[in-house]
Amino acid sequence: MNKLLTRFKASEHGGEYLMRFISAWLCSLILILPFRPISKVFDKEYAGEAPHLLLIIFFAVFYGLLTALRFIPKLREMKTDCAALLISTAQFTVAYAVVMFREKGTSIDFFLGVVLFIALAVWYTVGKHRIRLPKFTKKCWIAVIALSAVFMLVFTALAMAMRYYKLSTPAFDFGIFAQMFENMKDGLGPITTVERNYRLSHFAVHFSPAYYLMLPFYMLFPHPVTLQILQGIFVTSGIIPVFLIARKYGFSLIHSSLFSAIYALYPAFTGGCSYDIHENCMLPAFLLWLIWAVEREKTVPMLVFALLTLLVKEDAAVYVAVIGLYLILSDRSEKTRALGAVIFGAACVYFFAVCAYLNNSGLGIMEWRYKDYMYRGGALITSIVVTAFTNPGYILSNLFTGEKLTFTVQTLGVLGGIPLVSRKIARYILLIPFVLVNLMPTYQYQHSIYFQYVFGSCVLVIWLFIMNMSELSYNRARCFTVFSLIACAVMFMSTMTGYWGNFYDNDYEAHGAVISYLEQLPDNANESITANTFFIPPLYKQKELYTINDRDEPTSESAPPADIVLLDRRNVKFETNYNYFTSLGMKEVTIEDERVACLVCRLEP
C-alpha cells in the first residue's frame, strides 16, 4: 500500500493517473447524455435520475483504453494522457454548451463557469507538459484552412439561404436589399419602396456604392438567395488574409492556420450574418486585406482596399481613419507612416463629405444612436469629443452595462483578453471602433454579436490578437492559441447552435407553395402590393411594394393601401390589419391552393 501511495505521489505518475481519471470521467459524461431519463441536464433533478451504472461502465472502458495506450511502444513518448485531457475538456465544454443553449437559450453563464477549467487544462497540458502535435499534422495546415472555410460557409451562407425558404427573412433589411438589387439589375439604380414606404434610393439612407461589386454575381443568378450566399462568401474569405497576416508575424504554417480556425469560430463573424445581407458584410474581407497590405508595405493594395472599405458605408471611414492614425503613431517605417497619414486624411475628408451629402440630399446620418452623449445645442461629433474630454467618467459608466459586458466577454473574453495587452501604446488606438461603434451607442443592436455592426471593430480585435500574440514567448503563444480555439468553440456553440434550426422545416411544403405564389406576383405589371414583413423578400420583383409596419392603430403611412394586400395569418396583428383594410372597402379574395391560403390572406378593392 505504501509503495502504491509513493508511486501515486510522484509528480509524473500521479499527474498521469489524475489526467486519465478526469479524461475518462468527462468522456463518460458526454456519452450518457443521449440516455438521460429527463429532458433537462441543467436541473438539480438530473443528478438523481442520471444513468449511474452506464456512467460507471463508460468510465471503466475509457480509463482502461487510456491505460492500454501507455503500453503501446510508439505512443509512450506522445503524452497520451495529456492529449486525452485536452481533447476531452474541449469535447465536454462544447457538448455541454450545446445542451445549455437548447435548454436555456443564449447565455454566457456556462462559458464563465468553464473558462477557468479550460485555462487550467490548457496550461497543464500545453504549457507545463508542452504537449505537441504529431509531426504529420504539421503538414495539414491546408486542411485546417479548408475545413474552417467550409464550416463557416455552412453557417454564414447555407444556413442564411435556408432562412429565405422558411419564410423567416423580414422586410428589414433583407426585403429592402432584395428589391434594391432587382432594380439595380433592371438599370433603375439602388431604388426601393420598402425602406420608407415610398420610392427612395437606398443611398439616401446609407451611402454604399460597394454594393455594385455584388451586382455582376446577382445578374448571373438573379434571386434573393444569391445575396445570402454572397454575404457568407465575403465574410468567410477573411480566413485567407488572417492566415497571411499571422505568417507575417512569424507563426508557423500550422499555427497560422489555427488563427484562421479561430476566425471561423469567432462568434461575432458568424453572428453578424444572423439577420441576412447587409453592406457591412464586405468589411471583414476589405479590412483584412488592407491590414495584410499594411503589414507587407504594399502601397497600391493598401490604397485600393482602403478605398473599397470607404465605399462600403459612410461609417466605414472610422475603421480606415483609425488604422491610418495607428500607423502614424506606430514605430513602423517612414513609408508606412506616410501612407497612414494619407489614408487617415482621405478617410476623414470622405466621412465628412458623405455625411454632408446624407444631411443635405438624403435622410441624414443616424446620430440618434448617440443621443445619450449629445448635450443641449451640441452637434454629434463635437458633443462626443467635448464629453470625452470634460466628462470621461460619464462615458465610462455607460460602457459596461449588462448587455455590453456580455458582448465584451463574447468578443474579447474568448481571446483571453490578449487584444487588451500590449507594450506598444499605439496599438490601443485600434480599440477605438470597438468602444465608439459597439460600446458607446444606446442602440442595443450595436453591442450584439447577432448584428452586422460587429464586423469592422472585431476585425481590428483579431489584428490586435495576432500582433500581441507575436510578442509572447513561444510556449505562451501556443497556450493562448489553444485556449482561444476552445473558448471560441464553446462560445460559438453557446450562441450559434440555433442556426441548425434553419436546416429543418416542418412546413416546407406550405412555405414552398407560398414562396412560389408570391414570386409570380403581381398578376398585372402596374399593380402595387402591400404585405406583411416576411412576405416582402419573395415579392422582390415588384416595383411598387410596401411593407406593413404593425401598429395598434394602422394608418396610411404604416400600412399603405395598394391594389393587392397580402396579410400573414401568423402575424399577431392579423385581425387588426384585416379590420383596417376591410374598413377601406377591400375584400378577401379566395386563394385556390389550400397550402397558400392557410398562411396568406389576399385582399383587393
Task: Label every model-predicted segment.
Residues 176-201, 209:
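Extracytosolic helix-loop segments that constitute the early lumenal/periplasmic catalytic or substrate-binding loops
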Residues 63-74, 394, 405-435:
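Hydrophobic, aromatic-rich transmembrane alpha-helices
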Residues 108-117, 318, 428-474:
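Hydrophobic/aromatic-rich transmembrane helices and adjacent perimembrane loops
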Residues 79-80, 236-268, 284-285, 300-301, ...:
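Transmembrane-helix signature of polytopic, membrane-embedded enzymes
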Residues 249-250, 279-282, 288-302, 328-334:
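Membrane-interface transmembrane helices that cradle and orient dolichyl/undecaprenyl
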